[in-house]
Amino acid sequence: MAFTSIVTVNYNQPEATLALLASIKLNLNSDDLEIIIVDNGSLTDCGARFKQCMPQIIYIRSEANLGFAGGNNLGIKAASGEYILMVNNDTEVVKGITDVLIQEMEANPEIGIVTPLILYFDQPDTIQYAGYTPMNYTTCRNKTEGLMEKNAGQYAGISKETAYCHGAAMMCRKADIMNIGLMPEVYFLYYEELDWCEMFKKAGKKIWFSGKTHIFHKESISVGRESALKTYFVTRNRILFIRRNASLVNQIIFGFYFTCVAIPKQIIIYILKKRTDLIPYLRRALTWNITQAKDSLKLGFNTVA
């Protein structure tokens, strides 16, 4: 089987990263792999702990938090594998996952990125991802296929094109990345893998879902807590994604929808939830998109922990 690089990014979650390494050690043949851990500006340098678990890992430490894309890009640049599997550090792999995903890609050279079935770690009979529907460019909304369905084998063996991959687990060819480009770092977090998929599709590649294997993701089924950081980047990047990928007509329609419907609705929700402290971050996200170019690396938010 082709040599594969597994890339994961750690940010102040050493225990999760160690659990991922343990699952790799248990379930995958290390002779065909290189494991790259990028520490994304964590408060504590845990490289020695990671190497104690798997001495052969390649450990890269960034003094700054470069975001989801920036951290993964550091790992991609260091990778020597023909194939690269990027996984969140809060995932755990199963036997043969790399072999199955490589087989999918080798069977169809048009595949640019493939993501497996994703199951919730704490409720392994529940599906988190089985593909994405296409984006509605007038609202910047789409749906996750399979979300919250009980896993009764309904996606087992299914191999199909989908609109977008899932950032928790993505395999692609190193050669394709070198041709198409690294993950866009303008987002910092949220929407970057969707934009990357758009880049691959514009280059003639397909985004793929495979139900022939799966991965467990420790992201909670419950909705994550609202925060200033989440409010700002979700809002900012939703607009930015449309600016970077939609036609001018759709950008105009989206602009009216977002300012006249989506933002007022969100303000009402925050008022009802007694989270009026988050409303200024909606305004800040809008202001950033008005004042910054769509390829600006200025985040507009202090991300230092």
List the model feature ranges, each with a label:
Residues 229-234, 248-305:
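Non-catalytic, C-terminal membrane-associated alpha-helical segments of glycosyltransferases
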Residues 178-189, 194-216:
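Catalytic donor-sugar/metal-binding loop of nucleotide-sugar-dependent glycosyltransferases
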Residues 61-79, 89-91, 100:
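Glycine-rich, basic loop-to-helix element that forms the pyrophosphate-binding segment
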